[in-house]
């Protein structure tokens, strides 16, 4: 996708997926505006990775929005009294790492930011193949939110809508790693683990998904 002369707000968590989307946008010559959230997550270390990726790609602007979802919890990512699941990804089950309404909130804020700066796109690292079963990472969710974006702001009503850009939506993690290699994404600077420790736990769903892909690419874990 040619994004030259386009501007994009990228939801940049510091993880593998959002960092790869940032690399794709950079290679496509878009003006990139990064947006991260300090939402009371136990793995706040991801924000350091997000800042590192923003600097690596020399993006136009990078903002961290403080939005404390730990005030009401509801997820093991925002409530440390809840244990992280370590039994591996369970098919047809939404794990307790799901944060209620998180993507809806984040994309809504990104939509406001994008309209304020007259951006053309919102870049999201969601993918429907290698994910933990979250309801807000699926194609039907993205489709419906795009419909909402048409209706919910001035740009949409003037038939110049801000579009949700999801280049990874149909890719598995091995494919995403290939894109990361191809687009100068420093994998060792990204962060996926949910545990909140200084080093990846290797047991949470996010670590397991990443490790499986790493093994297929024969990447050593010390290159995490």
Swiss-Prot record:
Gene name in the database record: queC
InterPro entries in UniProt: QueC, Rossmann-like_a/b/a_fold
Organism in which the protein naturally occurs: Prochlorococcus marinus (strain MIT 9515)
Residues annotated as binding ATP: 12-22
This protein's UniProt keywords: ATP-binding, Ligase, Metal-binding, Nucleotide-binding, Queuosine biosynthesis, Zinc
Protein task: Catalyzes the ATP-dependent conversion of 7-carboxy-7-deazaguanine (CDG) to 7-cyano-7-deazaguanine (preQ(0)).
EC number: 6.3.4.20
Pathway participation: Purine metabolism; 7-cyano-7-deazaguanine biosynthesis
Cofactor note: Binds 1 zinc ion per subunit.
Cross-referenced CDD domains: QueC-like
Source organism phylogeny: Bacteria, Bacillati, Cyanobacteriota, Cyanophyceae, Synechococcales
UniProt record similarity statement: Belongs to the QueC family.
GO biological process, one term: queuosine biosynthetic process
Molecular function per GO: ATP binding; ligase activity, forming carbon-nitrogen bonds; zinc ion binding
Catalytic activity, as annotated: 7-carboxy-7-deazaguanine + NH4(+) + ATP = 7-cyano-7-deazaguanine + ADP + phosphate + H2O + H(+)
One Pfam family per UniProt: QueC
The keyword Metal-binding appears for this protein: yes
Protein name: 7-cyano-7-deazaguanine synthase
Binding site for Zn(2+): 193, 201, 204, 207
Root EC class: ligase
SUPFAM superfamilies: Adenine nucleotide alpha hydrolases-like
Cofactor: Zn(2+)
């Amino acid at each position: 996708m040619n994004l030259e002369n386009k501007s994009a707000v990228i939801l940049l968590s510091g993880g593998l997926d959002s960092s790869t989307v940032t690399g794709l946008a950079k290679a496509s010559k878009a003006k990139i505006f990064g947006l991260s959230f300090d939402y009371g997550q136990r793995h706040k270390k991801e924000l350091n990775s997000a800042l590192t990726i923003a600097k690596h790609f020399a993006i136009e602007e990078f903002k961290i929005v403080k939005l404390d979802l730990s005030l009401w919890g509801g997820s093991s990512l925002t409530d440390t009294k809840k244990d992280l699941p370590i039994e591996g990804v369970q098919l047809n089950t939404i794990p307790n790492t799901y944060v209620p309404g998180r993507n809806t909130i984040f994309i809504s804020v990104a939509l406001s930011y994008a309209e304020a700066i007259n951006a053309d796109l919102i870049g999201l690292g969601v993918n429907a193949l290698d994910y933990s079963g979250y309801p807000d990472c699926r194609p039907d969710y993205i489709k419906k939110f795009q419909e909402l974006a048409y209706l919910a702001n001035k740009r949409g009503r003037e038939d110049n809508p801000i579009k949700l850009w999801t280049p990874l939506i149909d890719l598995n993690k091995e494919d995403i790693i290939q894109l990361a290699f191809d687009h100068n994404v420093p994998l060792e600077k990204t962060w996926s683990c949910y545990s909140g420790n200084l080093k990846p736990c290797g047991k949470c769903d996010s670590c397991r998904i990443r490790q499986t892909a790493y093994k297929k690419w024969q990447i050593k874990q010390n290159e995490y």
